[in-house]
Amino acid sequence: MFQSLIAIDYGKARIGIASGQMITKTATPIGTVEAYDGVPNWIELDKIIKRWNPSDIIIGLPLDTQNFETDITKSAKDFAKEVQQRYQRKVHLINEAYSTREARWRLEEVKSKKVSHIKVDALAACVILETWMSEN
């Protein structure tokens, strides 16, 4: 069965978004949605969810390097609950440790001339999704 997925790299200022498919286990950055103190632009996120129509939404859970919760972990969990209620999709939380570092490394590897926050956040969502797909 074809399974479309969306991954979200939650942040207080921006939310990175990636799409993927379980059949190919590939992820593609979509872009970012602006957030204001952790509250996303729901209209933009609604459009993305409607367009991609994912069966599942994977959200990166910000934990520290020893898997302890951080200041933003509770906000990410609250966001995940709201996403589940709003879109009525399965929501999975996955440790996003090092996803931003991995995204920056990938951009440097391809010698991206402009390592913007938008690229990093969307690519971090790809890393989150690829990690989840490899584990499921």
From Swiss-Prot:
Keyword annotations: Cytoplasm, Hydrolase, Nuclease, Ribosome biogenesis
Origin superkingdom: Bacteria
One of the record's GO cellular component terms: cytosol
Nuclease recorded as keyword: yes
UniProt-listed SUPFAM superfamilies: Ribonuclease H-like
GO molecular function: nuclease activity
EC number annotated for this UniProt entry: 3.1.-.-
Compartments, as annotated in UniProt: Cytoplasm
Pfam families noted in UniProt: RuvX
PANTHER family, per the entry: POLYNUCLEOTIDYL TRANSFERASE, RIBONUCLEASE H-LIKE SUPERFAMILY PROTEIN
Biological role: Could be a nuclease involved in processing of the 5'-end of pre-16S rRNA.
Family (UniProt): Belongs to the YqgF nuclease family.
Name the record gives this protein: Putative pre-16S rRNA nuclease
Annotated organism of origin: Francisella tularensis subsp. holarctica (strain LVS)
